[in-house]
Amino acid sequence: MARCDVLVSADWAESNLHAPKVVFVEVDEDTSAYDRDHIAGAIKLDWRTDLQDPVKRDFVDAQQFSKLLSERGIANEDTVILYGGNNNWFAAYAYWYFKLYGHEKVKLLDGGRKKWELDGRPLSSDPVSRPVTSYTASPPDNTIRAFRDEVLAAINVKNLIDVRSPDEFSGKILAPAHLPQEQSQRPGHIPGAINVPWSRAANEDGTFKSDEELAKLYADAGLDNSKETIAYCRIGERSSHTWFVLRELLGHQNVKNYDGSWTEYGSLVGAPIELGS
């Protein structure tokens, strides 16, 4: 898949802010970032309240996703440009959702909010609303989603990529250092997993590294291209960034995101765990 099929540059974005059938959507770890300022005309998706089921641990189903996008003014035929802070961390998570529910025209703004701000491009604090649509999501494409039992069966059979920090991988901490150290019952990693922190795929300005650099990054870590791959992190958001790199940029077709990730796996009774690097 060519990069232009899944990425747009900041120059392209600034030239197409008001293009018909193009919708800019901001998704951030810091859900208040959009409220301070955002790309003019962009709408907000809150990863906690919009994309997660309010009761059970799962993301919104197809009906809920359809309702959400209809209310936000996104149509099935629109080209959705996702962006956010911190190397498009949660924007990539939302990209995976859109692909899961069959949206055909969805891309990431390469560099996200970080590069946009580094370039000195304009931001707006004006409220944004769009006319309501009648969006219809497709049934979920579970060929890009891994579940617990598949992960257990994949140990020493498929590629397992742990995209968390080395300290999380080794079991020193349970979550990113800036977050509460809670949720999973045990630290460590899935046996046989290789550790390639997700952020190593990005340049200093938040853009993705070249295909050649990315291929070398995973090859040097021991990724076997002949095997299927499952990526995981803590709750599935950082691993969606790695899923994007492997599948959408490098063209690996058999790649899944395990969104249950360590908060599920690290609390399973009897599941094998390794400590150390």
From Swiss-Prot:
GO molecular function: thiosulfate-cyanide sulfurtransferase activity
InterPro entries in UniProt: Rhodanese-like_dom, Rhodanese-like_dom_sf, Thiosulfate_sulfurtransferase, Thiosulphate_STrfase_CS
Active-site feature positions: C233
Enzyme class: transferase
Entry EC number(s): 2.8.1.1
Record: residues binding substrate: R238
Catalytic activity: thiosulfate + hydrogen cyanide = thiocyanate + sulfite + 2 H(+)
Alphabetized CDD domains for the sequence: TST_Repeat_1 (cd01448), TST_Repeat_2 (cd01449)
Keywords of the record: Repeat, Transferase
Gene Ontology CC annotation, any one: peptidoglycan-based cell wall
Ranges of residues in domain Rhodanese: 18-125, 154-274
The protein's role, per its UniProt record: May be a sulfotransferase involved in the formation of thiosulfate.
Record note on domains: Contains two rhodanese domains with different primary structures but with near identical secondary structure conformations suggesting a common evolutionary origin. Only the C-terminal rhodanese domain contains the catalytic cysteine residue.
Name by which UniProt lists this protein: Putative thiosulfate sulfurtransferase
Organism: Mycobacterium tuberculosis (strain ATCC 25618 / H37Rv)
